[in-house]
Amino acid sequence: AVCVLPGSAGNGLAPGALAEIVDPLPYVANVSNITASEVGADTESDGELAERIYLFPGSYSTAGPEASYLYHAKTYNANVGDVVVASDQAAGSVEVYFLLDDGSAPGPEMVTGLQNYLRDRQIRPMTDLVTVSAPADVLYSIDLVYYINRSDSNRAVAIQRAVNAAVDTYITWQRTIGRDINPSKLAERVMAAGCKRVELSAPAF
């Protein structure tokens, strides 16, 4: 199936949602998608383009440096966000882990697509066995109580919204491969939202 709208508008359609045959084929009575639609990407931001320009010189190498794999991974699709490359030189294997630009884990089609792209003979050295995977999730919970100044009681609803936004921002910030769970960053963001004091039970060091 091909989405008629550009960008990510066609992502997230559940299995079975795509069932209309546009170009009829002999002996094909019906069709249906078996996985959620994905891979559609919006135009990359200026920051993402600047990062690819910075990594571009690494693409000239055919020796398989880290910068080359980073560049090609981000070139594959504008939705590719954080990328980490690891290698076992003795085994000749290269492992590429990545997240989408919103911090979420990629779906199986995205993983397979990037792996096939990086395994192209024009990209990988002949001695490299490239494997692409989504990183393992690290689960954590958020449990906190915040207090505001009595003089700010008329702003309680606005502060509540700001605190919720601060928590969401922290969750997005935390979605980086290899980044430690940092409670101090959460407390810092919640305090900046207008709180007087924060008691943070989880996450904890």
Where are the predicted features?
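Catalytic P-loop NTP-binding/switch module of NTPases
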Residues: 1-58, 64
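Immediate N-terminus of the mature polypeptide
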Residues: 6-14, 133-135, 139-141, 172, ...
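Carbohydrate-recognition loop of C-type lectin domains
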Residues: 58-179
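An aromatic-glycine-centered, glycine-rich loop/turn in mixed alpha/beta architecture
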Residues: 160-205
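Surface-exposed loop/turn and secondary-structure junction residues enriched for glycine/proline
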Residues: 21-24, 28-34, 135, 174, ...
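Generic structural motif
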Residues: 4-8, 24, 34, 101-103, ...
